[in-house]
Amino acid sequence: MNDSLIRIKQNFIEYILFNYRFKSRITVWVLNYLKANQDKLNNVHFVNSKINNHYTLEIAEVDATASAIQLSKDNKSYINTNQIFNYIANHTLRLDIQIHFANCHIRESRLDDLILMQLIHSPSYSSYVQDLYSISMDKRKQTFIIQTLQNNIDLSLQMNEPDYFYQLTQILNVLKSKDIQSTLHER
């Protein structure tokens, strides 16, 4: 994963630590630990919803309806805060982080931007492409992203990068599909 995506994740973590209050102090510890450890942060993916067979750290803002903090994979869950911190600190694992906000009706635009950046730069994008359906963006931003993707698709062809071409094409198709669906709902 590239250094700019790591910096974007670090900035996002700083942003949420500064602007939100979490139910568990261990959440703050884990986020600060991940922010300071680039190798760990490289394996972190922020998500909108849990994905089967992925380790998922669920964290909750004060007044959210979800549990304060929980680490789960398949049918196994950890709720002991010290156990969660130690597990993350002492294991090398791909970790999804799902944030439960108190006001679930308002989207956090910085999270949406991060999700999009992760999709564009992550080789494991296909596991997360469904998150595109839940991010919000206005028409102007969506048009800009589509144009940028099209330019990068052209560039990937010129650079003879078929995997990146395929990745960007899939993301572009989902964005266009999302646009068509939202247009149908508006009618």
UniProtKB/Swiss-Prot annotation:
InterPro entries: IDEAL_dom (IPR014957), UPF0302 (IPR011188), UPF0302_N (IPR014963), UPF0302_N_sf (IPR038091). Pfam families: IDEAL (PF08858), UPF0302 (PF08864). SMART domains: IDEAL. Belongs to the UPF0302 family. HAMAP family: UPF0302 (MF_00760). This is UPF0302 protein SERP1032. It comes from Staphylococcus epidermidis (strain ATCC 35984 / DSM 28319 / BCRC 17069 / CCUG 31568 / BM 3577 / RP62A). The lineage of its organism: Bacteria, Bacillati, Bacillota, Bacilli, Bacillales.
